[in-house]
Each structure stands twice: as C-alpha cells, then as structure tokens.
C-alpha cells in the first residue's frame, strides 16, 4: 500500500456537493468542504407544484471545482502530491441528454435555459404516465418482463421514464440528443476528458437499478421493446445507449491536464467509476452482508447486500432492484427507500413558518430589520423546538396517523401517484403532537421496507443509520428503533457517501486490492447503538397496524382510473 496516499470522494447531493479528502491507510478524514448549487438555491428550473426538479450542469461543474479547490488548499504541499484518486457518487436516477460530443445539451447556448436539456433530478415526478406505460408494456405479454429484477414496478424517478417524458415533451431536445447519461457516470467522464458517448463507461449500479440493464437479456432491453414503447426512443438516440457496465472500484481514466491544473492536484490522479450515493454510502459505513443500511436525508435509500447463493434465481418484489456488484463486487445489491423523510419534516416546518415569514416581510417594510432577523432565527429553530416539545411529552394515545407519501412511495412497490394523508385529527391536536405523527410515519415507512425484505426470505440481521438526521436527531432515531423493534446502530461519520467514494477511489488507484480490504482501513465506525423500549414497542405496533389499514384504504383513491381528485 502507498504510504501517505490520499483519495478524494465527491458526493453530489440534492442541494450541494461535498468533497472529502481521506488518508487511505488510517481512514482519517483530513479535510472536507460543502458547496451549494447556486442556481438550485435560487429555485431556478424547478416547478415544485408540477413535481419538476432540474439541475443545471453548471451547478455541478462550478460547485465541484470550488469544493475540491478549498479541500486541496487546506492540505499541506506534501499531502497534495499524495492525492492519487477521485471517486464519485450522486443522487439517482438523475440523467441528462448529451450530444455526439458527450456534452450536456444545457451547456450549449441554444439550450442554456431549457430545463429539459438539464439533469432531471431523482425526485422529479413529471414522468408518472411514462412509467406507467413502461409497466403496462412489460406486463403485456408481448415481451419478457424487463422489470423483474427491479422489483416488478418501474418508477417515474428512473432513467427510461424520464427520457421518454422529455422526448415526448420537447422536440428540440429529442432531435439534438444522441444519448442520455446519469450524473454519477458523467462526472468521471468530464474529469477524464471522455467525450464520445460510446466511450463513456456506464456504472453497474445505475444501469442495473434504474436502466433495466441485466446480463440475462444482453444488457438493455431490445430495440423493438423501446420502439413499441414509443418510436421517439429509437429515432435519434443511439442504440444501444450502452452495452457493458463497470463496477465502481474499476478505474475509468486519468484526470486531464486541464482539470488537474484547475483543481491543483497531480496529473496522475485516477478516476474511479461512478455509483449512486446510497450504495457508496453503504460501503463508507462498513456494512456487511444482511445489514440493512438506511441512508437518511431528504429521502431515504435502504441498501442490503446478499450473497448470490441465498438469492439464487429468486426475484425480490416491490424493491428498487437487485444487481450483482452494485455495492460490492461479488454480492447482490438490494435497494429500497422512502421518497420523503427529511422533506416531510421540512414541508411541515414551512407550513408552520409561513406566518413568521409574512411577519418578517412586514417588519422589514416598516424599517425594523432587527425584528425580521429575530423571526428568521425563530423559523430556523422551529423543527428543533417541535421535536424537543414532543419528546418532553411523547404521548401516543392521540397521535395522528400520517401516511408518508408526500412525495409518492418508492418502497414497497413504487407508486408516485400517491399523496400524503393525515388522519385522526381532533380539536386537541397541537403542532408538536402532529409533528410526532410525522416522525412516526417516517418510522412506519422504514419498517414496511424491512418487512418487504424479510417477508420474502431475505434476513435483516442488523440495521445501520447514517446521515445528518441519524446523527443529530436521537428522538427521531429512537422512534425508528421502537417501531422497527430492532437495535439501531448510528454510524459515526456524517459524510459516509463521500467516504465511500474515497474508498472506491483507493481501490481504483491500486492502494487496496478490493473493497472489503479498503473498508478495514477506511470505513467509518459506529457512534452509538439505540435499543428498543419494550413499552413503546407495543403501542407503536398498534399504531403501525392502523397505518397499514389506512394505506390499504387510501391507495385505491390515487389509481389512474379513480374519480378522486389527485
């Protein structure tokens, strides 16, 4: 192993990018920097009411450059010379259209302000009808069921649904695009100077979980399937978009001289393959087989790795894919998740904070900026106070039952038509109690995922949680522990995704021979373990049964044939 070797992990989240420099031998996290996407912060190119969320590629380019340069500037001269690799993870499915030169269309002047020419963020749900069309065709009997290895349901959050939606909606983008690319694959291609779409290495993780790629049918679905779905998918797009895939520990190239100079790092830096944030975060957390890893943020992604012998030829229904090598080579990566977790809390905070925002505007107009500042400070602490107030008197006797479908449902059985539901309100329901219902709802969603695995013979032997909410909100995590009735281990690092990316870079650069070996040196430890409270477990079991009852009652109201207002 190279003494003093350092790798950098890049973690592209929904709001920001994080760069993390890690010592490959000790696992010490040397320096980190977070940079928020400027256009995204201004709300550009997004229409939340229409479920449209887009990222301009310049947000990624500018932010990654700033983040890495800050991290590098804090290292010593000697440390800078020991930077040997960069690993990348991102949200997903977050694809964008590219031209014959591998350029994102939004980087061309004629598409600079066209949201359809940008990255379609994972939580963009504009492609619900297209996802349903994919599911219908897969179940028609005309073709094999190409959804069988991704849980049996294709989601509007995923690759082909988004391509189909944009292609149908925007003729200019449809004519200009020759291929589409996931964010986690584009960044390594950008930094390594790989331009021709056919030369860009596509990650096993994104391809297997979101693009209907599987070796049993030779890669992507055949051209006649895509043509039957819509001829627009075969008119101008290259076919196949790609055939081969690579696991993320494999090198995809060396950084270009231009990028090395811009970032202040050696020209010998190796780029590892890209993968989705939660799969990479699972590696950063040091997870072992049959450990359910909950990566908790605005949403959750739940990852479990299993050996091929136990899964064999079985397909696990209702999840977001089972892919050989999507997490660690040699193991099947199983993915699930909740479409909203922290986003639900944030929505409730915005709802209650509206009056504070309006009052702040009034005070500013009246020449009292100090009062505006005070109100803004109150709003910033609103969720913290709600959590504390509910924790001081966490009565479960009159807890509202909330369905955690505020951004649709990812698992079990993806359905993005679903909406959030709040039940069991009365005139005595106050804000902290209702917020307690929101906390319980996210925990109920977590339990439903665990049961989806266990009910199909996939054991969950351990549960880990990582991310900002996991580390900073013991109240919420204790509710999850009680609802799941399992010990819950909290991972020490709050940047496991970037850490996992650095681990993949260490293997790609040849510092470690494989991912398990690299994990022994670099993965995070456990900060603390929460244990279930037996009395609260029993009460939550009753509430969970009511949650399930409401799920069964509410879901039919959001079917496409329902007369209910969506």
UniProtKB/Swiss-Prot annotation:
It catalyses: D-ribulose + ATP = D-ribulose 5-phosphate + ADP + H(+); L-ribulose + ATP = L-ribulose 5-phosphate + ADP + H(+). Disulfide bonds: none annotated. Keywords: Arabinose catabolism, ATP-binding, Carbohydrate metabolism, Kinase, Nucleotide-binding, Transferase. InterPro entries: ATPase_NBD (IPR043129), FGGY_C (IPR018485), Ribulokinase (IPR005929). GO terms for biological process: L-arabinose catabolic process to xylulose 5-phosphate. GO terms for molecular function: ATP binding; D-ribulokinase activity; ribulokinase activity. SUPFAM superfamilies: Actin-like ATPase domain (SSF53067). Pathway: Carbohydrate degradation; L-arabinose degradation via L-ribulose; D-xylulose 5-phosphate from L-arabinose (bacterial route): step 2/3. Its EC number is 2.7.1.16. One of its GO terms (cellular component) is cytoplasm. PANTHER family: FGGY CARBOHYDRATE KINASE DOMAIN-CONTAINING PROTEIN (PTHR43435:SF4), RIBULOKINASE (PTHR43435). Belongs to the ribulokinase family. This is Ribulokinase.
